Design a protein with these regions (language model features):
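Short C-terminal beta-strand
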Residues: 194-203
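Two-component histidine phosphotransfer core
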Residues: 1-187, 195
């Protein structure tokens, strides 16, 4: 097993070499990748403030932007209240796999160009936090959407199973952390796009219920 410090030191060396060779793009991408790698090493069960999750998403986008150039847009289109980003807790690496799905299964089939927009608001009826990820990709038929959150079948095609596992796992982690009333809902229309809504409780860092449910109590 490779020592994580060796990986981080190597990435820092690459960043330093890129800087002195006046290659800012490489330096920026390596910096983003190093931060993502450190976050991955911390695991996915821990609850983090939404603003920390958004920072991870920004690092992921930095890397993908260099891959796709100006053809890809990922943007937080609206934040209803800045306090949501500071106070709302979310399982680490919830947004990144959903955005990855939107890119590889929604935008790539139409040439890798398009947008993924994130809207952050509250449900006026319940006070829950709603994160809506909308892409303008190829979309999906209703019969496919209906089973996306089911537990993946063993015989599924590799690419579809990868997508299915990612969505199912994110939904499972949210429900494990907060209860069955929370998680993902998915709406999609072929040739129009897909919207994934994440429902979370509005609970601040250190909230006893969030801590209890995260520990399975």
């Amino acid at each position: 097993e490779v020592n994580p410090h060796f990986i981080y030191n190597t990435l820092n060396s690459i960043r330093w070499m890129a800087t002195i060779q006046h290659a800012p793009g490489i330096a920026e991408m390596v910096t983003a990748f190093a931060r993502l790698t450190k976050s991955i090493s911390k695991g996915t069960q821990k609850l983090v403030p939404l603003q920390e999750e958004l920072a991870l998403l920004n690092d992921y986008f930095t890397i993908q932007q260099y891959r796709y150039g100006g053809d890809l847009e990922i943007e937080v289109s609206r934040i209803e209240d800045d306090r949501l980003c500071r106070d709302c807790m979310i399982p680490r690496f919830t947004l990144q796999p959903l955005v990855e799905n939107a890119i590889f299964h929604g935008l790539e089939p139409k040439g890798g160009h398009g947008s993924v927009l994130l809207d952050i608001s509250t449900d006026p009826a319940t006070g829950d936090v709603l994160l809506r990820l909308t892409d303008d990709g190829v979309g999906m038929p209703p019969e496919q959407v209906a089973h996306l959150l089911d537990e993946p079948a063993e015989g599924a095609e590799k690419a579809e199973k990868f997508r299915h596992v990612g969505l199912w796992n994110v939904n499972r982690r949210i429900r494990y952390s907060f209860g069955e009333g929370y998680g993902l809902t998915i709406e999609s229309e072929e040739d129009v796009g897909t919207e994934v809504t994440i429902r979370l409780p509005y609970q601040q860092k250190g909230d006893s219920h969030a801590a209890d449910t995260a520990c399975g109590r």
